[in-house]
């Protein structure tokens, strides 16, 4: 399901104008990328706040409507107030369906509770990273990537290159090369734990 974001062009710019916007329940933002000039926008704070709480909003191609004109974008940055539950600014990047995009996609960890390491060995699952950098065409962007921990023994880990990625999705070059561990089953306290194997060269 496509996620729609409603915005309007922001005519007044600068610190004072942004402060007044926030007092009025709006959030300043910008849309950039592609062959079109950057556009300053404003969005409803409450709608944006709730959208940002959803995982899919951060790893989906969004339909941004600016004064009724729609374009496909990715959320690239959201700045939050240091101690208030307030969004201060957002950045969106335009995407082209014919050009690959580079996105951080969240990981969903499955079946740890039925793994030999947990069920038989009494181990504790540990998630080392919660997202990975991938590249794909916009139409192939997954909301998340599954990490099946069901076969893990105590002390064993799953690495990035072990994951089954959706069709059309690949890890970016540096992640492929580094092949980081993404999850491990730690030995129970007092037990002997193997050191996770280093990724193959």
Swiss-Prot record:
InterPro entries: Rbsml_bL25/Gln-tRNA_synth_N, Ribosomal_bL25/Gln-tRNA_synth, Ribosomal_bL25_b-dom, Ribosomal_bL25_C, Ribosomal_bL25_long, Ribosomal_bL25_short, Ribosomal_L25_dom, Ribosomal_uL5_bac-type. GO terms for cellular component: cytosolic large ribosomal subunit. The keyword rRNA-binding applies. CDD domains: Ribosomal_L25_TL5_CTC. It comes from the Bacteria. One of its GO terms (biological process) is translation. Belongs to the bacterial ribosomal protein bL25 family. CTC subfamily. PANTHER family: RIBOSOMAL PROTEIN L25/GLN-TRNA SYNTHETASE, ANTI-CODON-BINDING DOMAIN-CONTAINING PROTEIN, RIBOSOMAL PROTEIN L25_GLN-TRNA SYNTHETASE, ANTI-CODON-BINDING DOMAIN-CONTAINING PROTEIN. Part of the 50S ribosomal subunit; part of the 5S rRNA/L5/L18/L25 subcomplex. Contacts the 5S rRNA. Binds to the 5S rRNA independently of L5 and L18. This is Large ribosomal subunit protein bL25. It comes from Thiobacillus denitrificans (strain ATCC 25259 / T1). The gene is rplY.
């Amino acid at each position: 399901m496509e996620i729609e974001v409603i915005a309007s062009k922001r005519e007044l710019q600068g610190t004072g104008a942004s402060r007044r916007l926030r007092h009025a329940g709006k959030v300043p933002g910008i849309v950039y990328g592609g062959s079109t000039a950057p556009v300053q926008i404003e969005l409803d704070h409450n709608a944006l706040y709730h959208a940002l709480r959803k995982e899919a909003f951060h790893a989906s191609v969004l339909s941004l409507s600016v004064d009724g004109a729609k374009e496909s974008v990715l959320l690239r940055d959201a700045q939050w107030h240091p101690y208030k539950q307030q969004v201060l600014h957002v950045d969106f990047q335009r995407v082209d369906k014919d050009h690959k995009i580079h996105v951080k996609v969240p990981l969903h960890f499955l079946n740890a509770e039925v793994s030999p390491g947990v069920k038989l060995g009494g181990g504790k699952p540990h998630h080392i990273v919660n997202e990975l950098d991938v590249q794909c065409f916009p139409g192939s962007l997954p909301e998340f990537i599954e990490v099946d921990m069901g076969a893990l023994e105590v002390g064993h880990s799953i690495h990035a290159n072990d994951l089954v990625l959706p069709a059309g999705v690949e890890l970016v070059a540096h992640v492929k090369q580094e092949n980081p561990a993404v999850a491990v089953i730690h030995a129970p306290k007092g037990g002997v734990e193997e050191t996770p194997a280093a990724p193959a060269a």
